Regions:
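Asp-based, Mg2+/Mn2+-dependent phosphohydrolase catalytic module
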Residues: 2, 6-10, 16-132
Length: 132
């Protein structure tokens, strides 16, 4: 995952974590896993006053990131909170990370794409970076 985050940084793509965990827990996790310098912003449900899939956490992330254009990617593992929330609330392209204990969303929770390894997503990002 760190290689993917390095690629995003080199391409100048802003990144944010949008989480339902409390700020204290999320900040500790990010530091523990050595990811603190990879993300530009962390938005918690505590800050937003609502849990995902409410639009507030997503909107706060967009306000902080101020992305160029209207191409937003939401990468998450929860079909309802991340995938449907990202698509319905901020019109994001949705990418679902599949790992043990998760299933690909169906119906209104279906992602635009699903992946199991971050290297798969990294190859896609690099191809898109070559085109841009």
């Amino acid at each position: 995952m760190k290689e993917l985050l390095d690629d995003l940084r080199l391409l100048g793509i802003p990144t944010a974590i949008v989480t339902d965990l409390t700020a204290q827990i999320q900040f500790r996790k990010v530091v523990y896993f050595g990811l603190d310098h990879y993300f530009d912003y962390i938005v918690t449900s505590e800050e937003a006053g609502y849990d995902k899939p409410h639009e507030a956490p997503f909107q706060i992330a967009l306000e902080k990131m101020r992305p160029k254009g209207n191409c937003i990617w939401m990468i998450g593992d929860n079909p309802v909170n991340d995938i449907r929330g990202g698509r319905d609330k901020i019109n994001a392209i949705t990418l679902q990370k599949i790992h043990e204990g998760t299933v690909v969303g169906t119906g209104e929770n279906i992602p635009d794409a699903a992946f199991t390894e971050f290297n798969d997503l990294r190859r896609l990002v690099n191809r898109l970076g070559d085109v841009a």
